[in-house]
Amino acid sequence: MVILSLVSCSFSVFSPPISLRLHLPPVTSLCSHGTFPASSTFRSQLQPLLISCLNHREPALTFRCSCLSSPIESGSQIESLFSLFRDIGFIEEETEMILAKNPDIKSTSLDKIGARVASLQSLKINGFPLQGLIAKCPNLLTSEEFDLVISFLVDELEGRLDPELVERLLSVVDTSILLSFNQKVRLLLLHGIPKEKISHVLNKVYLNKLLYQKSVEDIERLISFLEPFGGIGIIARRPVILNSDLDSQLIPRVDFIRNLSGEDDFATGTVLRRLPAILSYSVEHMNGQVEFLKSFAGLTSEQVFKIVHVFPNVISTSKERKLRPRIEFLKECGFDSPGMFKFLSKAPLILALSENNLSHKLGFLVKIGYKHRTKELAFAMGAVTRTSSDNMQRVIGLYLSYGLSFEDILAMSTKHPQVLQYNYTSLEEKLEYLIEYMGREVEELLAFPAFLGYKLDSRIKHRYEEKLKSRGENMSLNKLLTVSAERFSKAADNIEMICL
């Protein structure tokens, strides 16, 4: 039985002798997109070819045909191509437009086109996004320049990039620049960007600028420059830094902060790690903020840096809307320049919170008894900058529900301002333990409000239960909690030995 195969049909004619290899197909023949029937029309088209080949006896003549690896030429194969595009979601007219934009598709094997589509789908590009990408960049299906990039995305990055990012990447006009993409990403990975974060990093940069304007050497220089201050960690938190120009932007800005710090690289790095976005501000802007604090608040350069060190956002805070009115408030409360520096070192958030936020908290403080234009009011304002207005209101309500008056709350917060900033839920648990389990009166907090700042399980419960074994219930809250862990442990050991 003689079998003819569309997948591999070859024969050679030599004279003499003559060698003939024929493989006749079964009922259907495979192509890269599926199967189609070996119709009578197809067979009638194939028969003259075979007869012609058999009757032609040129020496050393070889003929081969392969549906899967040969260009798409026959009508049936063109139909298979249209079928492939229909499965993607294109109608016939759209497919014709794509073929007109990229005629190379017709001369590319269905295997290759199908494999390219499968690779894109493995990168989570399906449905309308896939249609849009192919319609916009039909050369994506045939261009060899995409092979290395798609292989890199699938194999090395394990398909971790967001589909939207992949679409942006593969939509670039100049495909030649894609060849450097792999190198740039490998460089970031080599310097410590985890694979699971690389999509975040690339999503945050201006991708076209990174691809077109930054060479691998540029990126290497940038990372090396930032290395003494936190290097790749700063870039991971603020990827857009990669788009900055090293010589005209990053170096002058880092040098300004470093000079302000007294050339302290570690302190400079702390500022950059706390607020990498500070590098988006020009030297002129940063200098304007520093000079304002020096002139209007009477601070020295060293004092300004110490405030920047604990709260770098002061560089981004509006001078007229926030800095000026807050400093005026502190002056009205009686602070001179040294006092203002100490206050701002501990409560710098007062410089940045909104007017609405501060006005709500100021209203609560005045309601419980604080007087306007006093240092006590300022210290209380500094403490409550670390909590929300809602939490502060609930905390005051909680104290009132346990029988404390506004005067009691005022006395407690004057002695220990943090009592107004503690978390409501945590505070409720401590008050319940104090009253229900320790059997104490809530008024004891007036003498020692710092009780509310200790951790319930690891400090309050632990020490109370240890002391309960030897001293009974009547013991000072102050002595119970303020003694060091070492002294408390020794005392507990001594008591245990006496009991034995």
Swiss-Prot record:
Pfam families: mTERF. The keyword ATP-binding does not apply. GO terms for cellular component: chloroplast; chloroplast nucleoid; mitochondrion. Residues 1-64 form a transit peptide. One of its GO terms (biological process) is photosynthesis. The keyword Chloroplast applies. It is found in: Plastid, Chloroplast. Transcription termination factor that is transcriptionally active in chloroplasts. PANTHER family: CGI-12 PROTEIN-RELATED, TRANSCRIPTION TERMINATION FACTOR MTERF8, CHLOROPLASTIC. Belongs to the mTERF family. This is Transcription termination factor MTERF8, chloroplastic. It comes from Arabidopsis thaliana.
